[in-house]
Amino acid sequence: MKIAILQFGGTNCDQDVLHVLKDVVGVDAETVWYKQEDLTGFDGVVVPGGFSYGDYLRAGAIAARTPIMNSVKKLAAEGKPVLGICNGFQILTEARVLEGALTTNEYPKFRCHWTNLRVETVDTPFTSKFRKGEVIRMPIAHMEGQFYAEEKTLAELDENEQVVFRYVDENGKVTDEANPNGSLENIAGIVNTSRNIFGLMPHPERASESILGSDDGLRVFESMVDYITENF
């Protein structure tokens, strides 16, 4: 098993993800510079956070149009898992492999703090180690994290159980106060209809060891690895 961690100009969370996969989970992982393009031999992809290309045009817009993303789409078409974290989520929406868009936070400032999330579905390659309805903690760090989608798309996401995480209070209740960026329906992360592409704004790699304040995020990577082990 080998997992690719993409690097674009401005990516800055790649080494954190590499550490979690190699040193905490214990699987083979490798950073892949965007010019490499070919992802043959990899069983999964992580598109990590950062500020790819300085967030020029829109966050993720330039990275989404690099040739390596064609290889990501090809890998996903084979059923292999693709995880997009923060800027990675933005890139995946810009690449049109996930629904919706991430726009400037409702209160336009950079938000960097812990959030409570409610697990909405465990029927994905990334959440099999969670319990539906449990409240977990992960930090956010973004300026453009407000999830937006048209009403019809939101209804489809809910109907198909594609919403994976929502921002909630410590008791698991969806409230405006618990929503850090104005995301519609407090959405923090979604999957595609095939369920093997997952994007989220919170950072699971920053919550993968108890010394950091939470290890809830570790289960995202462990679930992904279990899925690869069982299917590829």
From Swiss-Prot:
Name of one Pfam family that matches: GATase_5
Alphabetical GO biological process terms: 'de novo' IMP biosynthetic process
Entry EC no(s): 6.3.5.3, 3.5.1.2
GO MF entry, a single one: ATP binding
Subcellular location: Cytoplasm
Active site: C86 (nucleophile), H203, E205
Gene Ontology CC entries for this record: cytoplasm
SMART domains, sorted: GATase_5
Protein keywords: ATP-binding, Cytoplasm, Glutamine amidotransferase, Hydrolase, Ligase, Nucleotide-binding, Purine biosynthesis
Entry keyword annotation includes Plastid: no
Xref: Gene3D superfamilies: 3.40.50.880
Main subcellular location of this protein, as a coarse class: cytoplasm
Record-annotated Glutamine amidotransferase type-1 domain positions: 2-232
Pathway the protein acts in: Purine metabolism; IMP biosynthesis via de novo pathway; 5-amino-1-(5-phospho-D-ribosyl)imidazole from N(2)-formyl-N(1)-(5-phospho-D-ribosyl)glycinamide: step 1/2
Catalytic function, reaction form: N(2)-formyl-N(1)-(5-phospho-beta-D-ribosyl)glycinamide + L-glutamine + ATP + H2O = 2-formamido-N(1)-(5-O-phospho-beta-D-ribosyl)acetamidine + L-glutamate + ADP + phosphate + H(+); L-glutamine + H2O = L-glutamate + NH4(+)
UniProt superkingdom: Archaea
HAMAP family linked: PurQ
Subunit-structure text: Part of the FGAM synthase complex composed of 1 PurL, 1 PurQ and 2 PurS subunits.
Function comment: Part of the phosphoribosylformylglycinamidine synthase complex involved in the purines biosynthetic pathway. Catalyzes the ATP-dependent conversion of formylglycinamide ribonucleotide (FGAR) and glutamine to yield formylglycinamidine ribonucleotide (FGAM) and glutamate. The FGAM synthase complex is composed of three subunits. PurQ produces an ammonia molecule by converting glutamine to glutamate. PurL transfers the ammonia molecule to FGAR to form FGAM in an ATP-dependent manner.
The protein, known as: Phosphoribosylformylglycinamidine synthase subunit PurQ
Source organism of the structure: Methanosarcina barkeri (strain Fusaro / DSM 804)
